[in-house]
Amino acid sequence: MRLLICALLCLGTLGLCLALPEKTIRWCVVSDHEATKCSSFRDNMKKVLPAGGPAVTCVRKMSHPECIRDISANKVDAVTVDGALVAEADLPHHSLKPIMAEYYGSKDDPKTHYYVVAMAKKGTGFQLNQLRGKKSCHTGLGWSAGWYVPLSTLLPSGSRETAAATFFSSSCVPCADGKMFPSLCQLCAGKGTDKCACSSREPYFGSWGALKCLQDGTADVSFVKHLTVFEAMPTKADRDQYELLCMDNTRRPVEEYEQCYLARVPSHVVVARSVDGKEDSIQELLRVAQEHFGKDKSSPFQLFGSPHGEDLLFTDAAHGLLRVPRKIDISLYLGYEFLSAFRNLKRGLEDSQRVKWCAVGQQERTKCDQWSAVSGGALACATEETPEDCIAATMKGEADAMSLDGGFAYVAGHCGLVPVLAENYLSTHSSGRLGSKCVNAPLEGYYVVAVVKKSDVGITWKSLQGKKSCHTAVGTSEGWNVPMGLIYNQTGSCKFDAFFSRSCAPGSDPDSPLCALCVGGNNPAHMCAANNAEGYHGSSGALRCLVEKGDVAFMKHPTVLQNTDGKNPEPWAKGLKHEDFELLCLDGTRKPVTEAQSCHLARVPNRAVFSRKDKADFVRRILFNQQELFGRNGFEYMMFQMFESSAKDLLFSDDTECLSNLQNKTTYKTYLGPQYLTLMDNFRQCLSSELLDACTFHKY
């Protein structure tokens, strides 16, 4: 009986019982043709994989959405899909993750994206804004190229199948419900139950099928990947029979797709479970597969092609697979522009009546909740553990805004966020407060300084090696990027844990020498945390670290003056005078802390509020309104103070006079300026930012 059961299981999964489950990669296939190719994949991998390595089995399902659900349910392990289908599946948060991305172009210049184009026969005359009432062919319901991109371009937000069915006279949208929306399946060519099927059983399924629908004269317009056009029509003579419909309501030749497309979309991607997903085994399997059966290999079996049909297991146009950085989840992979269109179509327009501020750590969350309570519904709060987590949350639409130091602004800019307003500081204006003029006052930036105790007379900038150092946090301008960038220029090494004897650099590995001086907080888990739970976090925390344990501290230039001479009532600052400290100058001399203008490491941009492009104007309006109520001269200043905190620098810097206009510096590059960008670009190889790696994975 046990043998009979195993035999039946093996028939259902094409050999699942022949390998140990923990060594088996269960690949999901959606058609007989894919099952045939997958069987060849399995058999050929047996020849090249080492003994004891992962084995491939093939599991037949009816559609890619079913594959996605079954990966989440641990019934299969992997499939290559359009990332939008994962977002569409509405699975538990982060249950699946992208692990290997198809790339196009050369190995030296891989492109992990493609262009979605609207294609029509030459001479048909209509433009993109004249598609109402036309016949259309689509790759499939829920797919980027054939569904979300054209619908978000052509139809009002919140519209989906119903609106598409009324917009076009008739269509072929494989995977659609033909009973509920008969016009969406009217043009499909499948017979019987195969009509409008969610696999190659429907001849017009996928990008190749949607193009064939146009070639057969079935439709007036087809929405496809540009790659498919060049694969299916290798000669210019064939392509010259068609034209692309452009966003400016003109037409262009097919060759000009880079100037005439609807959207640029991330490539198809191999997905697996986020937990116990066999990620390493799948990546190793595909690495070996590419080495033996990849593009331009002479083997009869081809990973990116098949005699049995098009785009089986992988896209035929793919040149290879790239490992996706671990930080990237499906939201980061797809990007906020695509997700914005996706969310609008799926749920309708987002609620734009309030700003969701991202607080870093519990202390900031407490202040944010106080602000939210008096904001009149204009502000809500989200919480993350690090500034980079807040950047990621904002990209995904889980938060809307936060104030960032220049170092994190550099990361946010690479992730597609934009500056909205800048902090303008009291200390930069010799004449005192600017009042109502502050919002348009020049942004002067601040100095990054290296501070030592006056009594440590032997320490200079040139004798820091082996000393104990205090840093605001890893990734910040004043505490890390500027001083470590200068040290890197001198040593050529990113091993900063070997340069200093011990340090407190919040955000580092808690077990490294870079956290050896940190004090943590009430919870041992807060040791070296990249937020205010670490007592030595921030500029004031770095000064405290210097007072209690360190030899040198890196901070903003006003910090010593803000925490001495009775200005800070905390026990560690009691009795401190600003004369107790000195600045280290780059020429090896030292100066009083009041002379930062002539003795500093660099001048860097002020902190700035960052948001998504689609939310930036709204965030700006809300913050100006809140500032009128709770800013330095606000009408409700006694109820809540935006720029004062129970701890140091919560949500905003405590020395902020106001949030100011950017004065035409509306991109992260123009805001940060060429000098800071050069510093960061030179220092980039020393940046341990998984998010920066994730946001620069797609090379546009």
Swiss-Prot record:
PTM characteristics: N-glycosylated.
Keywords: Disulfide bond, Glycoprotein, Repeat, Secreted, Signal
CDD domains: PBP2_transferrin_C (cd13617), PBP2_transferrin_N (cd13618)
Recorded consequence of changing W143R: Confers ability to bind ferric iron and carbonate
Domain called Transferrin-like: residue spans: 25-347, 355-685
Glycosylation sites per record: N664
Paired cysteines (S-S): C28-C67, C38-C58, C137-C213, C172-C188, C175-C198, C185-C196, C246-C260, C358-C390, C368-C381, C415-C695, C438-C658, C470-C545, C494-C686, C504-C518, C515-C528, C585-C599
Subcellular location: Secreted
One example GO MF annotation: enzyme inhibitor activity
GO cellular component, one term: extracellular space
Signal peptide range: 1-19
Signal found in the keyword field: yes
Tissues of expression: Detected in blood plasma, heart, kidney, liver, colon, lung, spleen, pancreas and testis (at protein level).
InterPro entries listed in its UniProt record: Transferrin, Transferrin-like_dom, Transferrin_Fe_BS
Protein family (similarity comment): Belongs to the transferrin family.
Function: Inhibitor for carbonic anhydrase 2 (CA2). Does not bind iron ions.
Subunit structure, as described in the record: Monomer. Interacts (via transferrin-like domain 2) with CA2.
Protein name: Inhibitor of carbonic anhydrase
Species whose genome carries this gene: Mus musculus (Mouse)
Source lineage: Eukaryota, Metazoa, Chordata, Craniata, Vertebrata
